[in-house]
From Swiss-Prot:
Keyword Thylakoid listed: no
Enzyme class: transferase
Taxonomic source organism: Streptococcus equi subsp. zooepidemicus (strain MGCS10565)
Protein name, per record: Polyribonucleotide nucleotidyltransferase
Catalytic activity: RNA(n+1) + phosphate = RNA(n) + a ribonucleoside 5'-diphosphate
Keyword Transferase attached: yes
Length: 714
């Protein structure tokens, strides 16, 4: 296929899609040019079905530093592992694409997005999402798209699609929404305490823009799309399924209704093991043994899935016996750890998170060096999910995509209420340790984070709480669930996380397993989430009503002083020599910004005071009219040089030593002698003139002698 180009304008910027020129050996490939951003997307599919029990989809978002005209930082001058932003963008693209493949599809699919040119005013992630959908849609890969995504900002009461950098910085909303022509299927958002009504309107505005992009894609698919390949779907034998359901469904139904998680898992596992053992014995010698046993396992999963959903939709009974809008039992505690800067323990049913606060000087902020201009990140929220939290063994090591994503969600939720740098000049790190999990652990980490911040004396604007909403839908009827647990998340159709204050929403995240949900469901879920959020906030405020007025004794104290910008180099010294000496002598940490704000940190107030004194003396300036107790350091014929303080000297001219005539300076002063002087002049070059005689009264002029008077008459 020769190169074909498709052009439109979207959100005020040119949008160009090129097909047929590059990456032609992939199943599908596109080059999307949006503004000055350019993204290459290639989609490929394995020829055979994988043997795993899940759909192996991999979506990558690769940031090439050359795209922004930047040289890679660090000693390795080559792109390495994906940045946090790249990982989050890959997840953002994966989530709306994944539900668009058929049930039982098991061929491995990879979608690789490479940013070739980066324009900070034209969203490369949204270009990559469009490219991913198009590459799959025009390929022979069985994909039930297209989908599209947009960013939505809210500036001065107006919604803006795919805002530029300045609009993003002015916005009260940072929303990414994706979906199909008919419905929304992915949401990711941070917001400055916006009400539910505005959030819902933003979603609808975003979906309307999505429909434009889908219409554009449909034109391209009609022109260059390939015929979809016939692939084998994972399907179980109907007769085997009927037999197992008839024989064992009643036992499995009973096991599923056990309310306590561990007991329920044990009961369902016992039924499954009995079924597997029976069929293992029956088909041990059968040549189709592996396929049959795979089917048995899949059938049991489907039976559990169907029973959990039936109980909720028909009987309105949840696995643990709760009402559909009921939260699990709550508990909150502060000061769980003695030596840290703040800690909070939050428990919701069998989900528990410990959040630990650490405060540090601004010099410890994380430097982010990606495609955007380098910047410093003041607030970090890290989320850890050890396998023991679910009673299992597993991999331990670097944070995976899920942990990075959950940490970022908590970061967005809590960042909206943090004090400004001027109010609270600290770098802030929260670490959420999930100690126990049965669903909604990311939202528990937000609640625990609020407790830790308030216990640590961080003056947040308001407490934040989070809740996860679920959905069970059969296409006609649906049930929205409050505070979903693990089983409801696994077998349900939606995981909709909502975090916020009493004032409004600070973060949203929605993933669904069906092709989309309606505005009515979104509105109902947001209303139900608000009620639950307020209930959790009641508990948080009962535990700690407001942030403590003081920091923990172990937290670094801070003091700030302002110096003239031209004195910064004096405090730092040649090669940092002076500031390093101050730090070594006092044990403090010191940060100096470009405007001359000096921040001094230490857990020892005396050390801070000593450092302040040293810095104050370094930047001290002599002022006209001030009096100093000085030391003579040099004598010349025309006067004496005296040291006022530190490295600041002044000249006492011979005429300023005394009111009477001084013949020789050395007759009156000697080196090392201490004298009081008054500054009488500072010129534009900083040279200082001082006077000794200005500190003593001028003697009266002598009266003329009578003799002289008489002599004049002679």
């Amino acid at each position: 296929m020769s190169k074909q180009t498709f052009t439109t304008t979207f959100a005020g910027k040119p949008l160009v899609v090129e097909v047929g020129q590059v990456a032609k050996q992939a199943n599908g490939a596109t080059v999307v040019r949006y503004g000055e951003s350019t993204v290459l997307t290639a989609a490929v599919m394995s020829k055979k079905m994988s043997t795993g029990d899940f759909f192996p989809l991999q979506v990558n978002y690769e940031e090439k530093m050359y795209a922004a005209g930047k040289f890679p930082g660090g000693w390795m001058k080559r792109e390495g592992r994906p940045s946090t932003d790249a990982t989050l963008t890959a997840r953002l693209i994966d989530r709306p694409i994944r539900p668009m493949f058929a049930e039982g599809f098991r061929n491995e699919v990879q979608v690789i997005n490479t940013v070739l040119s980066y324009d900070e005013d034209a969203s490369a992630p949204m270009a990559a999402m469009l490219g991913s959908s198009l590459a799959l849609s025009i390929s022979d890969i069985p994909f039930n798209g297209p989908i599209a995504g947009v960013q939505v900002a809210y500036v001065e009461g107006e919604f803006i699609i795919n805002p530029d950098k300045a609009q993003q910085e002015a916005s009260l909303l940072e929303l990414t929404v994706a979906g199909t022509k008919d419905a929304i299927n992915m949401v990711e958002s941070g917001a400055k305490e916006l009400p539910e009504a505005i959030m819902l309107e933003a979603l609808l505005v975003g979906h309307k823009a999505i429909q434009e992009l889908i219409a554009f894609q449909e034109e391209i698919v009609a022109a260059v799309g390939k015929e979809k390949a016939e692939v084998e779907l994972l399907q179980v034998a109907a007769d085997l399924q009927a037999e197992i359901i008839e024989t064992y469904n009643a036992d499995l139904q009973q096991a599923v209704q056990v309310e306590e998680k561990k007991a329920r898992e044990a009961a369902t596992e016992a039924v499954k093991e009995r079924v597997i053992a029976a069929y293992e014995e029956r088909y041990a010698a059968d040549e189709e043994h592996d396929r049959i046993m795979r089917d048995v396992t899949e059938i049991l999963e489907q039976m559990e899935h169907a029973e959990v959903r039936r109980l909720i939709t028909e009987d309105k009974v949840r696995p643990d016996g709760r009402r559909v809008d009921e939260i699990r039992p709550l508990a909150a505690e502060i000061d769980f750890l003695p030596m840290v800067h703040g800690s909070g323990l939050f428990t919701r049913g069998q989900t528990q998170a410990l959040s630990v606060l650490t405060l540090a000087p601004m010099g410890d902020t994380q430097i982010i060096d990606g495609l955007e201009p380098e910047y410093k990140k003041r607030f970090l929220h890290h989320y850890n999910f050890p396998q023991y939290s679910v009673g299992e063994t597993g991999r331990y090591g670097a944070a995976g995509r899920r942990e990075i994503g959950h940490g970022a969600l908590g970061e967005r939720a809590l960042a909206q209420v943090l004090p400004s740098l001027e109010e609270f000049p600290y770098a802030i790190r929260l670490v959420a340790e999930v100690l126990e999990s049965n669903g909604s652990s990311s939202q528990a980490s937000i609640c625990a984070g609020t407790l830790a911040l308030m216990a640590g004396g961080v003056p947040i604007k308001a407490p934040v709480a989070g809740i996860a909403m679920g959905l069970i839908s059969d296409g006609t009827n649906y049930t929205v669930l409050t505070d979903i647990q693990g089983l409801e998340d696994h077998f349900g159709d939606m995981d909709f996380k909502v975090a916020g204050t009493r004032q409004g929403i600070t973060a949203l995240q929605m993933d669904i397993k069906i092709e989309g949900i309606t505005p009515q469901i979104l509105e109902e879920a947001l209303a139900q989430a608000k009620k639950a959020r307020f209930e959790i906030l009641d508990l948080i405020e009962a535990t700690i009503a407001e942030p403590r007025p003081e920091l923990a004794p172990t937290a670094p104290k801070i003091d700030t002083i302002k110096i003239d910008v031209d004195k910064i180099k004096v405090v730092i010294g040649k090669g940092g020599e002076t500031i390093d000496k101050i730090i070594a002598e006092t044990g403090v940490k010191i940060d100096i910004d470009e405007e001359g704000n000096v921040s001094i940190y230490s857990s020892d107030q005396d050390a801070i005071n000593r450092a302040k004194e040293i810095i104050a003396s370094l930047v001290r300036e002599a002022k006209v009219g001030e009096v100093y107790h000085a030391k003579v350091v040099r004598i010349e014929k025309f006067g004496a040089f005296v040291n006022l303080f530190d490295k600041t000297d002044a000249l006492v001219h011979i005429s300023e030593i005394a009111w009477s005539r001084t013949a020789n300076v050395s007759d009156v002063l000697e080196i090392g002698e201490e004298v009081d002087v008054k500054v009488i002049k500072v010129d534009d070059k900083g040279r200082i003139d001082a006077s000794m005689k200005a500190l003593v009264p001028r003697p009266p002029k002598p009266e003329k002698s009578e003799a002289k008077k008489e002599g004049k008459h002679d």
